């Protein structure tokens, strides 16, 4: 009888632990697109292919069973000069509501890197805590503005927002490579498109999903192991990162290309501009 009780207790403990394991529904939210189509040769190094391709701009929403609503990058949130090159910027508010999430419900924002299209922040998510690499933060708030620095891909307003968030205690440096920074969300840091960009492996109900934002520029880059023409500090490191991504998932379909409009034909469309990866 005692043995039976122990078996039952062990089973209940296992079931309880399983029910408490953090997992997420992963959504892709489109908020803008390039005004004109592009070609492979314009987007990928070492190719002369002229395949036509359309570029969309997206962020990722992770809806957890643990009360977490996490954005991976935060997109354009107010007008900047670069906006003239984009169509249909919707500032995410309406798109978020389609997923039954309000801006104030966002608990965390994880920045893959610091380009203007990834974090143009203006208090749109008042309760969000922001995660960024320390080296990334230091480079984009200090070093890049010194002589010889590179800062063309972001603007001073969003940089100041990062500084304000840090001063206000709403920013954490996420340098723990290979570890969970939030339950069910594991961080990887590897040289790639930008300054040691961050990549995430997110636990969903059925599979691990790899999120690299637009570090995985287009499916052409992923399929042909081709570095992008724009923003890659090291083409060799970028290609190594692509291989690392493939080793972390069971199926490459769970490596969404972060700016490829064809994503919306690869996964079920929840509604216009919103898809769920599953």
Regions found by a protein language model. Give the residues of each.
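Active-site metal-binding motif and surrounding structural segment of the metallo-beta-lactamase
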Residues: 85-132, 251
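Cap/insert and terminal regions of metallo-dependent hydrolase folds
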Residues: 86, 197, 201-278
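Active-site neighborhood of phospho(di)ester-bond hydrolases with catalytic His/Asp-centered motifs
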Residues: 71-74, 107-113, 132-133, 190-192, ...
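Metallo-beta-lactamase
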Residues: 95-101, 105, 135-189, 233-252
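Short, electropositive alpha-helical surface patch
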Residues: 89-93, 124, 129-134, 188-193, ...
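Beta-strand-turn-beta hairpins that frame and shape the catalytic cleft
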Residues: 20-26, 63-69, 178-186, 204-209
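Conserved beta-strand hairpin/beta-sheet module of binuclear metal-dependent hydrolase folds
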Residues: 30-94, 199-216
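Bacterial Sec-dependent N-terminal signal peptides
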Residues: 1-22
């Amino acid at each position: 009888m005692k043995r039976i009780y122990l078996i039952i207790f062990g089973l209940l403990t296992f079931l309880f632990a399983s029910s408490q394991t953090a997992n997420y529904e992963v959504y892709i939210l489109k908020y803008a697109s390039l005004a004109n189509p592009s070609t492979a040769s314009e987007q990928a190094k070492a190719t002369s292919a002229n395949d036509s391709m359309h570029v969309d701009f997206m962020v990722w929403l992770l809806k957890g069973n643990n009360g977490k609503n996490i954005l991976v990058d935060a997109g354009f949130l107010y007008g900047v000069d670069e906006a003239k090159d984009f169509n249909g910027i919707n500032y995410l508010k309406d798109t978020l509501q389609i997923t039954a999430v309000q801006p104030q419900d966002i608990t965390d924002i994880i920045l893959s890197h610091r380009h203007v299209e990834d974090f143009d922040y203006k208090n749109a998510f008042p309760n969000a805590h922001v995660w960024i690499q320390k080296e990334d933060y230091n480079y984009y708030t200090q070093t890049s503005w010194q002589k010889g620095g590179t800062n063309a891909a972001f603007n001073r307003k969003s940089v100041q927002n990062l500084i304000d968030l840090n001063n206000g205690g709403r920013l954490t440096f996420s340098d723990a490579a290979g570890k969970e920074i939030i339950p069910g969300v594991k961080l990887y840091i590897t040289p790639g498109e930008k300054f040691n960009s961050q990549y995430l492996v997110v636990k969903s109900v059925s599979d691990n999903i790899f999120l690299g934002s637009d570090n995985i520029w287009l499916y052409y880059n992923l399929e042909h192991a081709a570095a992008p023409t724009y923003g890659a500090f090291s083409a060799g490191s970028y290609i190594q990162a692509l291989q690392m991504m493939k080793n972390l998932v069971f199926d490459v379909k769970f490596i969404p290309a972060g700016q490829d409009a064809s994503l919306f034909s690869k996964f079920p469309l929840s509604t216009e501009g919103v898809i769920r990866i599953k």
